[in-house]
Amino acid sequence: MAKGTAKGAAKRGKIKAEEPASPADASPRLPAGRHGLPREFITQNQRERIITALVDTVAERGYNATTVAHITKAASVSRRTFYEHFADKEACFLAAYEMVADHIRASMGAAAKSFGEWPQQVRAALATMLRFLASEPELARLCMVEPVAAGGEIAARHRATMQDFVRILKAGRPEHSGERPLPEATEETLVGGIVSLIVREISAGRSAELEKLLPDLVELILSPYLGTEEAERLARTDAAPTAD
């Protein structure tokens, strides 16, 4: 990634699928009184502060215990200002979630393109995702743990995002499924298992150690397609994926 942290960019609403780079963390507070700033700047500044506040508050309290009042207090904005930008807490969370998910998708795609073969692409994409989640524990919790607890539209959106990973794995079927066709639920099962392991580590406060899971996860993913021996060899390879 470019200079700055992904956490700051995501919390300020700066992460874009086509622009995974990020600026500095802190969102400046507007001075009180008549400041003479353009309305568009004020509006964007407020929105970024609200998203920043949501990420911080959800990391501290969890989604279900977080209220609009908590968010507005942390963002130093009024309830009226909050509702000018978001219909409710769920809409605010979804805005933050989508920015993080878009960033992860773009970073994984860029990493995969550095390799010509599908198995190496899978490894590079997974390594990039784990590195991002390990470096941004608040965002890791936001996009991997809280959606399940939140339920409703947030959980549905999260399930849809996980289907992106299912499609990545299904792309390897034509060349790597062997003589016997794989069960239809193979990719769903693999992604579900990987997500469960990642969520377990994040929930236990071990986000910083997520990259240690890479060899085991790569072997788990590739074994049905390549066989245990080849999957283990690729899992232990020191091939360096592109930076996120």
What are these regions (language model features)?
Residues 152-175, 184-196, 212-220:
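Amphipathic alpha-helical packing segments from all-alpha helical-bundle domains
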